[in-house]
């Protein structure tokens, strides 16, 4: 969400940013926002002028009442009373006009706020320009992609060899997009989460278990209406939504807060279940656990001063690379182009893991710098050294989402005999096991 003052002073830059995001249908919104802002500011100015006039008239009656009390001439008394009555009538008229202006201001503000929620955040100058994810740019690779000399089965087929998944039972219980994990596969799922938690704690992040449901105003503060409609499950009859990622409730922790400058940055890592309506949204890898309604995830967020957000962005995606490489999974960094950026993001990259079965990379993490977009909506602020109130910047990144992580892990650590190697860093979380042996 942009500052209306910035939009007012830089309309062409805002329009150019919209063009770079290939959202030309939103171009008229810039002029509409400026017109509503002008209307709002005029209503405020007119209201202030009327308030001053009203105060002036009210004060003028004081001396008149004094004169009236002392006056003995009936004609003069009548004239004074007439002046007092005229002032009172003007005060009443001003009050009615002020109420009308207040209504006009509130209506303009409501319409303006609705538009401002739709105008996208200014993207960083380094973001590649393109209409969709086909224009995302590979930045660098980490680790050598593997090409096994044996056929790598589909991930659910690998899991079934360990009696590790039951999607049929989940379908009977919950419908499509759900699963039961069992045995060593379930242990592996939990081991990855526990390792990711300790990995981030080791990087200085504070571990957090957040609320799994949040109010609508928090949802509106952390994401666009389009993303909200596509992702979030609402609790019927309640002002509560199931979180699609713990980033939402972790960022929401700071709503309407003034954080002491010496307490920045705030660095949190959290575990949570995540709930999303997105099953089938992208038409890729729909079988199995790649795209599902419910999964668990370890997330990281940073709330910092504006001058520090670019540094944190670089650090955060590198944490993801380091974690995946410690699990013997080759990855690459993919810079998201302008058309692939959600409206609140000014810069984002995906970390993609190598799939030996498909012989291509697929997304496992997404790191984003949202600038002051979320902070402006949620009023997350700090006081600088001069005592001036400033908006914080917010960032988020997936540490690990085990459903997709499991796909990458199983494919990259699968052996020709059907067993799966357990990387050294995971063995303490797997009871010391060095290898998972299939049951059939």
Language-model features and meaning:
Residues 27, 141-440:
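TRNA-recognition modules of translation machinery and tRNA-sensing kinases, especially anticodon-binding
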Residues 1-145, 160, 164:
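N-terminal alpha-helical targeting/anchoring segments
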């Amino acid at each position: 969400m942009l500052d209306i003052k910035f939009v007012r002073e830089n309309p062409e830059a805002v329009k150019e940013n919209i063009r770079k995001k290939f959202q030309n249908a939103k171009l008229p919104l810039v002029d509409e926002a400026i017109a509503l802002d002008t209307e709002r500011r005029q209503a405020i100015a007119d209201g202030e002028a009327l308030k001053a006039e009203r105060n002036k008239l009210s004060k003028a009656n004081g001396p008149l009442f004094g004169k009236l009390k002392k006056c003995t001439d009936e004609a003069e008394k009548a004239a004074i009373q007439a002046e007092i009555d005229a002032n009172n009538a003007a005060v009443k008229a001003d009050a009615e006009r002020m109420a009308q202006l207040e209504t006009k201001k509130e209506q303009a503000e409501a319409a303006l706020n609705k538009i401002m929620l739709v105008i996208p955040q200014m993207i960083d100058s380094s973001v590649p320009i393109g209409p969709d994810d086909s224009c995302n740019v590979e930045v660098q690779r980490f680790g050598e992609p593997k090409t096994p000399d044996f056929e790598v089965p589909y991930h659910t087929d690998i899991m079934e060899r360990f009696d590790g998944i039951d999607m049929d039972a989940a379908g009977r219980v919950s419908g499509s997009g759900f699963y039961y994990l069992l045995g060593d596969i379930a242990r592996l799922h939990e081991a990855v989460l526990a390792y990711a938690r300790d990995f981030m704690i080791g990087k200085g992040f504070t571990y957090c278990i957040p609320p799994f449901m949040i109010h609508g105003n928090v949802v509106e503060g952390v994401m666009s209406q389009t993303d909200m409609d596509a992702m979030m499950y609402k609790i019927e009859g309640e002002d509560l939504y199931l979180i699609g990622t713990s980033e939402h409730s972790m960022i929401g922790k700071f709503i309407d807060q003034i954080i002491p400058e010496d307490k920045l940055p705030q660095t949190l890592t959290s575990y949570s279940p995540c709930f999303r309506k997105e099953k089938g949204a992208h038409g890729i890898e729909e079988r199995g656990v790649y795209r599902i309604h419910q999964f668990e995830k370890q997330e990281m967020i940073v709330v910092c001063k504006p001058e520090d957000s670019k540094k944190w962005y670089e650090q955060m995606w590198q944490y993801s690379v380091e974690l995946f490489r410690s699990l013997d999974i080759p990855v690459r960094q993919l810079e998201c182009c302008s058309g692939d950026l959600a409206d609140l993001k000014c810069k984002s990259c995906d970390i993609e893991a190598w799939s030996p079965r498909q012989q291509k990379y697929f997304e496992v993490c997404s790191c984003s710098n949202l600038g002051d977009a979320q902070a402006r909506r949620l009023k997350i602020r700090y006081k600088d050294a001069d005592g001036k109130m400033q908006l914080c910047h917010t960032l988020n990144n997936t540490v690990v989402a085990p459903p997709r992580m499991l796909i990458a892990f199983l494919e990259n650590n699968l052996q020709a005999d059907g067993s799966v190697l357990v990387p050294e860093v995971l063995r303490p979380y797997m009871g010391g096991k060095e290898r998972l042996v299939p049951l059939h």
